[in-house]
From Swiss-Prot:
Listed name of the protein: Large ribosomal subunit protein bL34
Organism for this UniProt entry: Ehrlichia chaffeensis (strain ATCC CRL-10679 / Arkansas)
InterPro entries for this protein: Ribosomal_bL34, Ribosomal_bL34_CS
HAMAP family: Ribosomal_bL34
Family: Belongs to the bacterial ribosomal protein bL34 family.
GO molecular function: structural constituent of ribosome
PANTHER family (UniProt xref): LARGE RIBOSOMAL SUBUNIT PROTEIN BL34M, MITOCHONDRIAL RIBOSOMAL PROTEIN 34 FAMILY MEMBER
Length: 44
């Protein structure tokens, strides 16, 4: 049985990247919350 994490840079960027976050209302909320926390990295 293989592990659960099968790395793929394309899938990572598409699912968790900045543009996918900006494309939904909830995603923008995530970004704003991370900005408020003072995160250096906002998303993948």
């Amino acid at each position: 049985m293989k592990g659960t994490f099968q790395p793929s840079r394309i899938v990572r960027k598409r699912r968790h990247g900045f543009r996918s976050r900006m494309s939904t209302k909830m995603g923008r909320r995530i970004l704003n919350r991370r900005r408020a926390q003072g995160r250096r990295v906002l998303c993948a």
